[in-house]
Amino acid sequence: MSTKHHAPTNSTAKDTTSGLFHLNTLPAVQAVAEQLEGTCLSSTWPRLEADRTEQLNSNATLFSGGSAPRDVWAESGLGATIDASVVATGSPLSLIDLCSMTANTILGINDPWVKLKQAAYLLSWRPHYLTARIGCDLYYRVARRILRCFDKFGEPGDFVINLRQCNGSDVVELALHAAWKAAYQYPARRKLAAFRGSYHGENLTANWVSEHQPGRLLAERPDNVVFFPTPLVDAAGELTEDALATLSTLERDGDRYFAAIIEPIQWRNSVHTVPFEFLRRLRDVCTRKSICLIFDEMQNAFGYTGTISFAENCRVCPDITAISKALTSGHGSLAIIVAKKAYREIEGPFGAKSNSGNMLPLVAVDAVLDRLLGMDPEKAKALPAWLPLSLAAELQTGLLTTAYPRAVAMIDEMLAELQRRFPSLIGASKGMGLVRGLVMLGSDGQPSVRLAIAASKVCLIHGVYVRQADTAILIKPCMVLTQAEVDAALIGLSRTFEDVLRIRDEK
């Protein structure tokens, strides 16, 4: 295979209309893929251990509750589209994923650049896995790239990073541990401020500090977690009395708190965005009272609000930022904290999880940063000559400045049209950027959990995937959403809401 490089503008490779394509459509990759055909490594090799009906249906003998296959069987996918079939009928289904496979795949399904970088790494002699006691260049490159995104909130070197966690629950626990460790020498600081409407994960620690709990786990909630009301503004856009009272309480009793943890966008709370003014005032109180401010950014970081971190949106920098999900765009499990140096001390076993030694998620983060922010110009000159011009161009500019505003504009237009078509069913549009919610209204005009659940179930029949988020449906698409996919989603959601209206009227 040729090692010749080029600047994208000089490429003679066949172009595509967007940066999305399946890898096996590239001639340079086809040469390898052809060698796999007819072998057990072929992607078309028979792999079902039973007929499709058995595989599609929930099998209580084979699967535990909560993990059984559901209503749709996926065959392939690209961007926001999953090529699938329906369980009940076996008929083909083109499914538009409006939840980026539940809040992970910011770049959609099968992003070619992330897969190419991972494939290149796998073809190398580099270790695919390293224990926490052994380092490599990849750790340092990814760490420095992420930390540079926080330089605007201080001087280079003001922040540190931990790259050795596997999921959002892990990093919530790690963030709380780092805050607790920093305050340990002050015995009076043992309280944690949390908020109604919050959801921080499913492990024991994250469960304790969440209002939305998946179920009671092993022990009762500790008595040092104080839940304050959901921060809101009134009709005039001013902070409510409850929000102001929260700030006053923390000002008065701040010496008793070691940390405050908050989600900038509470997705389980009907996709509620915390008012920026509240975050600014909370930051001021936490600074004055030496309370560690933690942002749980699982739902918004790495592109969903057009930035790497929410600090860039609200101009409020927390002491610790916890990030997961979109980090790898679904190409592996990884979670991180970025913390001010005062919170760098971490004790074992919190510092590193076993599966965090997998190098492929780190390769994925590096590639996702290429896609979101653009590559270093010198590195971009070394892009392969056979790479389609469209992808090469995107890697020069980054998707945050191009694809993100287009995707938001398309979603804004779609949500407005749905509200116009179904004024008695659809209430407020919540959230921001690509983290959005549509509130479902009952016949009494009040937000309805029942109808939000119904919509999240019915939508699959009509070729759209959304999630229920309390009284709203969560709409959180990938950044590379196309107009054709939005048009198909509008049709599918319109049919969904017509069914939900019938369900509502039947009661």
Protein language model annotation of sequence segments:
Residues 2-507:
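Conserved N-terminal phosphate-binding loop of PLP-dependent enzymes in the Aspartate aminotransferase
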